[in-house]
Amino acid sequence: MTSTPQKKPRKSSTVVAKPVKKRAAKKPTLPPNPFVNEILDYVSSQKSKIAKVEALKEYRNDALVSILIWNFDETVISMIPEGDVPFTPNDSPQGTDHTSLRREQRNLYHFVKGGNDALNGIRRETMFIQMLEGLHPSEARIVILAKDGRLSEEYAITYEQVKEAYPDIQWGGRS
């Protein structure tokens, strides 16, 4: 006699859902040594003033601080005429450009009053155009906006946020 295997009775199928753990949203970060336009885009994308200030603190570098001072300090007088600059944008992909604002930061003093007043106006403007042509178009746009004090028109960053993020900056008395 062959015995047939008996089937085990099935248990009732009541499924109890496990509580879902909410993961904290991963904070997007920038690559090491980010370009100034990447930093400003990231800071602008932050929703709160506190988050913007923290982002400015985290990604502080000399080029960023110089651009922000040029833009927000009313005593910094640009020696480059206001308005659009006739230059040919660099069409190289970002990162393969001839230069970056981090490298050009040390030459920005040529373009403000008190920096290199002995420089001929035409030579100064030629140097400015050459610098812009070596930069990625996004960084060149930032320099043009900063020279006219119009950075806040394109990026959601205010003087108060910069002042809070960088309390060591002495504002005023530069010209």
Residue ranges and their predicted role:
Residues 2-175:
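N-terminal nucleic-acid-engaging modules of covalent nucleotidyltransferase systems
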